Amino acid sequence: MGLMNAFDSQTEDSSPAIGRNLRSRPLARKKLSEMVEEELEQMIRRREFGEGEQLPSERELMAFFNVGRPSVREALAALKRKGLVQINNGERARVSRPSADTIIGELSGMAKDFLSHPGGIAHFEQLRLFFESSLVRYAAEHATDEQIDLLAKALEINSQSLDNNAAFIRSDVDFHRVLAEIPGNPIFMAIHVALLDWLIAARPTVADQALHEHNNVSYQQHIAIVDAIRRHDPDEADRALQSHLNSVSATWHAFGQTTNKKK
């Protein structure tokens, strides 16, 4: 089928002026791959292709849309990034449902760009504080004995990793991940994983010796958080969590200042 651009006939000379000095301009033409992507996305959302069903072959899509193979492949790759199709080597694309990870993943590029701007890290740290504050309050009020045992196990691994910075960072992330798992909401999990990934990637490189003291402080603060959750005291759990994250934020800010002075 032919795909026409609705704005092909516009020209700058014939367009009226708007505002004080602005003249309207022709909008950029869409690529064929973008038009194919949009049409396939609408077909999927209209349930013309159900979840788990295979799309037509590349050759069939080329004939249907009257486009070349590169346009079809670019369109399918874009749909894959949106979580609308799965593509395995040698097989036709199969319709899938976007997961929470897919939704958050679409924001990753924008988030990393935001973090690189002045104040970006501080804003994300505040977001993490608000988010995890709700998580620990929920955990203190609703965590089962089994979930508290998982926190205790994560804490034990934390204690065994104090002298190995790479291992401690992993155990630290795992500890906070267990907190995020307690409500059983996959969106919370996806947000939490992404937040930590973005913040950790933005942290400066620090000498191992400087991190050892920080590891011990974080571990003691983790103990306070778990103790409050075990006592089912949401206010104390919140205070312990806020003390911990404010301490982490201040420590990494100081590390960053030191690193910048050395440059």
UniProtKB/Swiss-Prot annotation:
GO molecular function: DNA binding; DNA-binding transcription factor activity
A Pfam family this chain is assigned to: GntR
SUPFAM superfamilies per UniProt: GntR ligand-binding domain-like, Winged helix' DNA-binding domain
GO BP term, pick one: negative regulation of DNA-templated transcription
DNA-binding positions: 58-77
CDD domains: WHTH_GntR
Disordered: annotated segments: 1-22
InterPro entries: GntR_C, TF_FadR/GntR_C, Tscrpt_reg_HTH_GntR, Tscrpt_reg_NanR, WH-like_DNA-bd_sf, WH_DNA-bd_sf
Keywords in alphabetical order: DNA-binding, Repressor, Transcription, Transcription regulation
Record-annotated HTH gntR-type domain positions: 30-98
Purpose of the protein: Transcriptional repressor that controls expression of the genes required for the catabolism of sialic acids.
PANTHER family cross-referenced by the UniProt entry: HTH-TYPE TRANSCRIPTIONAL REPRESSOR NANR, TRANSCRIPTIONAL REGULATOR, GNTR FAMILY
Family: Belongs to the NanR family.
Designated name of the protein: HTH-type transcriptional repressor NanR
